[in-house]
Amino acid sequence: WVDYNSNGYVAGPSLINIEESHNFFNPKAGLTYKLNNFNNLYFSYSKGNKEPNRSDYENGSPLPEELDDFELGWRLKSKKINFNSNLFYMNYKNQLVLTGELDDVGSPIRTNSGDSYRLGIELEKNWDLFDFLKWNSNISLSKNINKSFYFQRNGSLINLGDTNISYSPSTIFSSRIIYNRGNSSIIFSNKYVGEQYMGNIDSETSKLDGYNTSDLLINYQLFENSDIFKLDFKFHIFNLFNKLYSSNGYFYTYDLNDSLSGQVNTIEGVGYYPQAGRHFMAGVTLEF
């Protein structure tokens, strides 16, 4: 049970008056089947309800979102390798999705999308190749869809059909190779994020290109066996290959009225948050 009340002025200034009550029931259930000492299968179902936040109420009249989450997985655990696979289907009603727009204080605006779903698979692997070398990686492949999404374009409300949910790349991959020898370690990490849309209308203007970045961390420790103090040196190279990319941004639309023809034209705009090129961080830690 959630009781949400707020009364007062917000930026503008404008008066906000919220009086909302929600009664939620969020059951969860699952089964695990042990195949042998190394493998098990599992299935789970959960019901989730979530109320809008204050910013959502300030920017509209939102409804709480409702989720039915189904998951099916396999786990492998052995001496050298751990592997997890997870199939998921998340069916939403009134999911609160980002529109791509920002409010007057720069906070992202969300809206209810009606019916939507997320369907995909997650794979995770932790592999001890040797005593001194490990390789950890994970990948997520998904389809994230708004069903029959409506949008006001050029003065008319149109059904765009199925569209991609904003800020939901279909592919995310990360990998870490960890080398440990004595009192030194080297970690090479890589991350790939596929292309995504910053809005829910599948506009090419709102598309954010995929990117692939790598980091390198070098660590060296002195006096590691000392009972008095330890000295730790770290050198971190971010964006090792100096990739130029934007990891986020915003997308907005507005209507422009032609005073001569009386026609309404929907204009699209976009902004990006470019990330830093190759950069470094060094540190020394003295531990007593």
Where are these predicted regions, by residue range?
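Transmembrane beta-strands of outer-membrane beta-barrel pores
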Residues: 1-5, 45-51, 78, 87-93, ...
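Signature of Gram-negative outer-membrane beta-barrel scaffolds
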Residues: 1-36, 136, 151
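Gram-negative outer-membrane beta-barrel transporters
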Residues: 4, 89, 111-201
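Conserved C-terminal beta-signal and adjacent last beta-strands/turns
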Residues: 32, 43, 68-72, 130, ...
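Outer-membrane beta-barrel translocator domains and adjoining extracellular loop/strand segments
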Residues: 5-13, 52-60, 95-104, 142, ...
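Membrane-embedded beta-barrel scaffold of Gram-negative outer-membrane proteins
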Residues: 34, 40-44, 64-150
